[in-house]
Amino acid sequence: MDFLLLGLCLHWLLRRPSGVVLCLLGACFQMLPAAPSGCPGQCRCEGRLLYCEALNLTEAPHNLSGLLGLSLRYNSLSELRAGQFTGLMQLTWLYLDHNHICSVQGDAFQKLRRVKELTLSSNQITELANTTFRPMPNLRSVDLSYNKLQALAPDLFHGLRKLTTLHMRANAIQFVPVRIFQDCRSLKFLDIGYNQLKSLARNSFAGLFKLTELHLEHNDLIKVNFAHFPRLISLNSLCLRRNKVAIVVSSLDWVWNLEKMDLSGNEIEYMEPHVFETVPYLQSLQLDSNRLTYIEPRILNSWKSLTSITLAGNLWDCGRNVCALASWLSNFQGRYDANLQCASPEYAQGEDVLDAVYAFHLCEDGAEPTSGHLLSAAVTNRSDLAPPESSATTLVDGGEGLHDSTLEPITVAIPGGEHAENAVQIHKVVTGTMALIFSFLIVVLVLYVSWKCFPASLRQLRQCFVTQRRKQKQKQTMHQMAAMSAQEYYVDYKPNHIEGALVIINEYGSCTCHQQPARECEV
């Protein structure tokens, strides 16, 4: 069939005048893409791709046509003038990153209709006109990161219906205009991290029905309202790390398919009880390094699909309010950080939350403590072991049919609580005994080493001990003899009135004295 059509065309052309044939051939040649001009000096050409990188160029090369790709990165371009790339109508990608560009005129990209990828990152651009990207309706990827943009023109991205990736990281953007992305219906990735955003308008992200990943980390946001992300039905990941967020609220009751949320490194003190009910498919949540003191039971009940959570670095108050969190963690089968420490009260500061619940009997109600089960469940979770068949029944378990009124006070019924306490007591006794034996063995070892290494010193020390003991015995003997002599003076002495010899007895012997009869003097 193709050969038949070709033959008919040739037959028709041969029957026409030669002038008509020449005109038709000229028109065909004009429709063919032009071949690229000669490769500029010091540049690298690969077919219809031109790489003029790190050549300290201050202007783009001239007389270029027929190129499909042009890279001018790592040069010294300072300005993009109007019509600078008009001869590159076949161009599909243009790299201008890592230059010194500070000015981009509104019609600098005229006649670049086929460009799909544009990179302007790592320059010094402070503003872009509304018409900057109008000549390039087929753009798929735009990179404006690491510039000095302070504001975005309201219609900067107007008409970019095929745009899928937009990078604006590390600028100085302070505000996102309302409906600025209204025409970006195909956008899937948006990065506005590391800017100076202080607030978000409710319709700033309107129209992004296909957006799957949104980065807003390292800004100055002080409040997060899920109503600022309306109808982002395809959003899968939301990063709000390292802002100044103090509260998290949701003023719209609607459900979205978010699976990953990062709120770490903020200043969160309060979260509305129903805030996570709008994200029932959430699997990964980062809440570490905030100022949370406790978590509402209603929030815990809404974390049914979580498989990973980080809660460390908060100001946990290990009072009665921590019981709901402790019970939820004891039943949680996913991954969570093990270093949850109490910040208050003083007697529990620095203690692990679950250990404090057990040690200080924080969640006891009547005679049945909750601590034994919480500790055993925590150990089970941390060692990735399967939970026991007869697990405890708690009021905060993420199950069905629970209301807020049933969560105060929180109690835990534990059939084997006494066995757990007995096991802990036995463990303490065994630990103490082993410590005592270990101490005794250390003392014996020290004596043995001393005896082997310093025998003369030990012999002298033993002789000193023996000499001192002998002296002590002699002193005791002298004291005993003195005591016996004193008893003889007071017990055996019998005075008599017989005139004659007096016998004096002391410890050195006896002495006899003769007493002369007294004579009375006459007066």
Swiss-Prot record:
Membrane-topology descriptor: Single-pass type I membrane protein
Pfam families for this protein: LRR_8
Membrane spanning stretches: 429-449
Ranges of the LRR repeats in the UniProt entry: 64-87, 89-111, 112-135, 136-159, 161-183, 184-207, 209-231, 233-255, 256-278, 280-302
Keyword ATP-binding part of the UniProt annotation: no
Gene Ontology BP terms: establishment of localization in cell; exploration behavior; locomotory behavior; long-term synaptic potentiation; negative regulation of receptor internalization; positive regulation of synapse assembly; protein localization to synapse; receptor internalization
Protein name in the entry: Leucine-rich repeat transmembrane neuronal protein 1
Domain of life per record: Eukaryota
